[in-house]
Amino acid sequence: MAPQMYEFHLPLSPEELLKSGGVNQYVVQEVLSIKHLPPQLRAFQAAFRAQGPLAMLQHFDTIYSILHHFRSIDPGLKEDTLQFLIKVVSRHSQELPAILDDTTLSGSDRNAHLNALKMNCYALIRLLESFETMASQTNLVDLDLGGKGKKARTKAAHGFDWEEERQPILQLLTQLLQLDIRHLWNHSIIEEEFVSLVTGCCYRLLENPTINHQKNRPTREAITHLLGVALTRYNHMLSATVKIIQMLQHFEHLAPVLVAAVSLWATDYGMKSIVGEIVREIGQKCPQELSRDPSGTKGFAAFLTELAERVPAILMSSMCILLDHLDGENYMMRNAVLAAMAEMVLQVLSGDQLEAAARDTRDQFLDTLQAHGHDVNSFVRSRVLQLFTRIVQQKALPLTRFQAVVALAVGRLADKSVLVCKNAIQLLASFLANNPFSCKLSDADLAGPLQKETQKLQEMRAQRRTAAASAVLDPEEEWEAMLPELKSTLQQLLQLPQGEEEIPEQIANTETTEDVKGRIYQLLAKASYKKAIILTREATGHFQESEPFSHIDPEESEETRLLNILGLIFKGPAASTQEKNPRESTGNMVTGQTVCKNKPNMSDPEESRGNDELVKQEMLVQYLQDAYSFSRKITEAIGIISKMMYENTTTVVQEVIEFFVMVFQFGVPQALFGVRRMLPLIWSKEPGVREAVLNAYRQLYLNPKGDSARAKAQALIQNLSLLLVDASVGTIQCLEEILCEFVQKDELKPAVTQLLWERATEKVACCPLERCSSVMLLGMMARGKPEIVGSNLDTLVSIGLDEKFPQDYRLAQQVCHAIANISDRRKPSLGKRHPPFRLPQEHRLFERLRETVTKGFVHPDPLWIPFKEVAVTLIYQLAEGPEVICAQILQGCAKQALEKLEEKRTSQEDPKESPAMLPTFLLMNLLSLAGDVALQQLVHLEQAVSGELCRRRVLREEQEHKTKDPKEKNTSSETTMEEELGLVGATADDTEAELIRGICEMELLDGKQTLAAFVPLLLKVCNNPGLYSNPDLSAAASLALGKFCMISATFCDSQLRLLFTMLEKSPLPIVRSNLMVATGDLAIRFPNLVDPWTPHLYARLRDPAQQVRKTAGLVMTHLILKDMVKVKGQVSEMAVLLIDPEPQIAALAKNFFNELSHKGNAIYNLLPDIISRLSDPELGVEEEPFHTIMKQLLSYITKDKQTESLVEKLCQRFRTSRTERQQRDLAYCVSQLPLTERGLRKMLDNFDCFGDKLSDESIFSAFLSVVGKLRRGAKPEGKAIIDEFEQKLRACHTRGLDGIKELEIGQAGSQRAPSAKKPSTGSRYQPLASTASDNDFVTPEPRRTTRRHPNTQQRASKKKPKVVFSSDESSEEDLSAEMTEDETPKKTTPILRASARRHRS
């Protein structure tokens, strides 16, 4: 068939070209074999050189055959074919303009060019797609083989780099489509198949996941421009819209690519309508359908979000279509629509020059954003806060919205979602950084100016009202105001007899009507009503023909007539007459009337200025009010955020730290609290948190403002000193760690150290507190670089321990702390060969310490005791033979005490008087000093002496090893084996430890030792609280006794009863608190001795004193987490602290359970006992507190097996519950567990246990809440069992257990649970013991009862003898504070040092 006679139909699939489908339709005649392809291609090339692009009409079968065998042919042939087809199409596109412009073109020639065009384009595009398919497969192989050699593999597969060839082909097709090729078709209507052929190729290229890589950017741009031409010239919009929607649903990587394309079409190609079409398609998607297609929804959401960023103005007109998705289930679509709104606010609807309609739109968008700040989905709430953060950062939020959005952010701080909390903090930080009010936000500083300016505004408004009232009163109003009095005056005048009238007002002959009217007006204005009336009566006779005096009605009374005339004169006609006939010579009338009537006009400039001032003042007050409200909100936020500083999530903690840095920089006074509160985080195990704290303090303190290095150093020292004011020991230790870090990294300039020394030595004038803080800072820095203090030791001794009196003990104490940091006690060991750093006994430091302590002993200074404690510690830490120095100090102080006592005796005149008494403070000082020496002597023996013994042994062994003959080393293989196993060293360590223990037990408190001399005195004070009732003395004596008990197990055992008596019965909280610490230390040192007394330790957790409860909580936390005490049901006392009114104690308890939850199944094992104790009517807590505690504890149960086991035990516990309250508690606990389907089956299996209790509404509600939770995450197959459980619940609730039998579900022969009988008082716990499966829930005996002997069958009936702490007691026998013999625990249970796992099992 001649080429001009057939028609080439574009096929949907290549196989269609092999079949005849109609008259004159082109059909491939033969698919050539592979071996014939190269010569046929060469023939095609020869024909092309002769005939041009029309050569394709005779050689299409060759190209078709190449496409057919594409996978099998040689890469070189593929490349040659591609290059040749590019050349053919390019040549055709160059020739077509002339052909299209040829008016003489015949139909057959036009048809030939149309066929050639379609064949050329079809061949080139199919070849492009074939290469693209092979490239995609190669990329998949590359993912398996790795990235190396990828280009080489691609080149091997194709014979060239395909990625570089795509762009030229696409540009060639674009160039071709830009021609007016539609004239080749009949009626100039291009066929849809041709457009689909070209555009379909573009869409297939876009499906490649690598298309959005940076290297493929030229290809993306070429595709975009090709599709842009198809949109503008070939009516491709509808098809493009449908295709884009489909691709967004199926290809997640395409959202940013399509956004870039659509943005380009809308702007450069003027196709704005495509944005509306695509958005309309997305808007019409059913929300339920989107919730089932997360992949498609993700694509739509990403597309809308990025499109709003690029073309917000174009998208804004279509926003109404998307609003339905704000109510849809899918949170991603809500986020996308909200993000689009935010972009429009940022890019289109910002600024002060918006029109009213634009402002309304902006306000609607912001209202929507605020509303979704409370969205049910945490990701939406979080996104809203992020969007508001951007809006605030770009200053696009109207000032009128500040308070509302800040309030939203503050409210979201309490959100359950960590992500929401984090973004709320970021939003508040953005508000601070971009607030329009002030760089310093202190509500205290703002309150004064606000009050002052508000008062000024009120005064200005009052003046304004007064001026307005007096300046321009309406004449009608004035007339109405004067009318009553005017009438009264007129009636009085008219009632007077004719002869008694006052002298009439004279009217001069020269006066005109206007003059007289002016006079009347002035008289009325001055309230001279009588004269005005008389003059009016006179004028009615004088001017009978002139208005208004000529207006006389015979029927009117004289009173009415005169009032009418006066009214006309005052209210207007006089003024109008004056305007018509002004006269300067009329004086009073003209002047008066002009002033009255024109006063507002004359004061217009003044009034305008007044209005401006009032407006300015109103704006100032509004500004101050907004600033004050903003500051108050930030202050409120600080309180909430500070509580989040110890969250488990690292990112939240980092945000909190950054927030406080910013707040501090803005001068908010409460920020210092947060800056101090973050200090303990320096000990965090999370490197990110620790580094955040260090960075915070770098920002706040290491870069102060100042013109010089010295000025900066001064500011830095001043800021750090403020942190030390009223700081606790813990705060100081944290700050010391931070400064140590800075010093080690040389971040503190030498000028800082220099200035600190100048202040410490008083070279720079400073107050005593500043001097003290300087020494403290020097001591902290010495942790990092000991030479800071070590090189100036004598100077430091002179500063704090000089010979002046009275001594500044606070400064002396800080000097001791600073000197202590020059030793290596906190440094990593350099090896046991190096002797510890010690100073000789004769060193001036110890002379001054001995003298200062001894001299201060006899003076009642409260600061002497803490100084003395630090001094004793320093002596034992740095001195050679510290026990000698401290013995001298003890002897010197005791000698002075005896001297004082002797002075008292000699001063008594009558020897029969009561024996001389030592001043209380001296006795307190003496016992406190003895206690400190006792404890430090113990520490010295167990650390320093033991360490030195070990060091010398190691050196001795090394020396012996060196001197041994080589033959001797191999003689004893047994010895070598022991050495390798470390048995020799371990035995030696045990020997040394035994030696130290023997010294402590046998020697330190032996009668010949110095410390032993103080024991009788100490025991006498502790045993006689009535005789020695001074609180400070009691505190010192109890603490000293605890320290003495640490030395010897024998002494400790003999005094434990006394210690625990004081712990329980002392009326002084400080004594109970001190003894709680002491007994905690004893529990670690002598666990077997203290174990029987453990219930007394737990008892302090319910102490009425807040200080004691806090100390007890800390001590028990330490003991339990270190496995030093057995954890039983008594741990419920720790649980009660979760509801303590003191926030610090509650936080301590929460932290305890957080840590305990990390110890395997600890909390799971304890829960049964805790629930039993807390729900016990006599020992437990109220119902609401019980809920709070259990909600926290049950949150730690996360394992399915634990949950299932607990559910079973709790259900069975219903059988043995004694009260309705216990049943409600159990139901609540069940409702708080994270139940699964297996847990629900356990509940169904044990339904009989609680079915008869469901008539109680609260129990029924608790179980219904379980059903609600299970439904939320239930799978379709699990819903049946949930329905079954709910039906059972409802049946039992309405009809009791009999209702179950009416239901045809569950087990047919379910038995009714026996009705729970109330147990008798005598056998209160019997039901629990009888239930084998509920052993874990047996309520232990109340803690308040004493331990019984094994054969005791009933509670002791005797009451404990109470000890009365009274100063009126007469004899020492009656003053005994010890427990009686039967109160002392007899059975001691050794505590085995087993692993935590064994201990818990």
From Swiss-Prot:
<feature type="modified residue" description="Phosphoserine">
    <location>
        <position position="585"/>
    </location>
</feature>
<dbReference type="GO" id="GO:0005654">
    <property type="term" value="C:nucleoplasm"/>
</dbReference>
<keyword id="KW-0539">Nucleus</keyword>
<dbReference type="GO" id="GO:0000779">
    <property type="term" value="C:condensed chromosome, centromeric region"/>
</dbReference>
<dbReference type="Pfam" id="PF12717">
    <property type="entry name" value="Cnd1"/>
</dbReference>
<dbReference type="GO" id="GO:1905820">
    <property type="term" value="P:positive regulation of chromosome separation"/>
</dbReference>
<feature type="region of interest" description="Disordered">
    <location>
        <begin position="956"/>
        <end position="978"/>
    </location>
</feature>
<feature type="modified residue" description="Phosphothreonine; by CDK1">
    <location>
        <position position="1389"/>
    </location>
</feature>
<keyword id="KW-0132">Cell division</keyword>
<dbReference type="InterPro" id="IPR026971">
    <property type="entry name" value="CND1/NCAPD3"/>
</dbReference>
<feature type="modified residue" description="Phosphoserine">
    <location>
        <position position="1395"/>
    </location>
</feature>
<keyword id="KW-0158">Chromosome</keyword>
<feature type="region of interest" description="Disordered">
    <location>
        <begin position="576"/>
        <end position="611"/>
    </location>
</feature>
<dbReference type="InterPro" id="IPR007673">
    <property type="entry name" value="Condensin_cplx_su1"/>
</dbReference>
<keyword id="KW-0905">Primary microcephaly</keyword>
<dbReference type="GO" id="GO:0051301">
    <property type="term" value="P:cell division"/>
</dbReference>
<feature type="modified residue" description="Phosphoserine">
    <location>
        <position position="1366"/>
    </location>
</feature>
<feature type="short sequence motif" description="Bipartite nuclear localization signal">
    <location>
        <begin position="1342"/>
        <end position="1362"/>
    </location>
</feature>
<feature type="modified residue" description="Phosphoserine">
    <location>
        <position position="20"/>
    </location>
</feature>
<dbReference type="GO" id="GO:0051984">
    <property type="term" value="P:positive regulation of chromosome segregation"/>
</dbReference>
<dbReference type="GO" id="GO:0034451">
    <property type="term" value="C:centriolar satellite"/>
</dbReference>
<feature type="modified residue" description="Phosphoserine">
    <location>
        <position position="1370"/>
    </location>
</feature>
<protein>
    <recommendedName>
        <fullName>Condensin complex subunit 1</fullName>
    </recommendedName>
</protein>
<feature type="modified residue" description="Phosphoserine">
    <location>
        <position position="1367"/>
    </location>
</feature>
<dbReference type="InterPro" id="IPR011989">
    <property type="entry name" value="ARM-like"/>
</dbReference>
<keyword id="KW-0131">Cell cycle</keyword>
<dbReference type="GO" id="GO:0000796">
    <property type="term" value="C:condensin complex"/>
</dbReference>
<comment type="similarity">
    <text>Belongs to the CND1 (condensin subunit 1) family.</text>
</comment>
<dbReference type="GO" id="GO:0005737">
    <property type="term" value="C:cytoplasm"/>
</dbReference>
<feature type="modified residue" description="Phosphothreonine">
    <location>
        <position position="1339"/>
    </location>
</feature>
<dbReference type="GO" id="GO:0000793">
    <property type="term" value="C:condensed chromosome"/>
</dbReference>
<feature type="modified residue" description="Phosphoserine">
    <location>
        <position position="1371"/>
    </location>
</feature>
<comment type="function">
    <text>Regulatory subunit of the condensin complex, a complex required for conversion of interphase chromatin into mitotic-like condense chromosomes. The condensin complex probably introduces positive supercoils into relaxed DNA in the presence of type I topoisomerases and converts nicked DNA into positive knotted forms in the presence of type II topoisomerases. May target the condensin complex to DNA via its C-terminal domain. May promote the resolution of double-strand DNA catenanes (intertwines) between sister chromatids.</text>
</comment>
<dbReference type="GO" id="GO:0016020">
    <property type="term" value="C:membrane"/>
</dbReference>
<keyword id="KW-0963">Cytoplasm</keyword>
<feature type="modified residue" description="Phosphoserine">
    <location>
        <position position="1333"/>
    </location>
</feature>
<dbReference type="InterPro" id="IPR032682">
    <property type="entry name" value="Cnd1_C"/>
</dbReference>
<comment type="subunit">
    <text>Component of the condensin complex, which contains the SMC2 and SMC4 heterodimer, and three non SMC subunits that probably regulate the complex: NCAPH/BRRN1, NCAPD2/CAPD2 and NCAPG. Interacts with histones H1 and H3.</text>
</comment>
<dbReference type="GO" id="GO:0036064">
    <property type="term" value="C:ciliary basal body"/>
</dbReference>
<feature type="compositionally biased region" description="Basic residues">
    <location>
        <begin position="1345"/>
        <end position="1362"/>
    </location>
</feature>
<keyword id="KW-0498">Mitosis</keyword>
<dbReference type="InterPro" id="IPR016024">
    <property type="entry name" value="ARM-type_fold"/>
</dbReference>
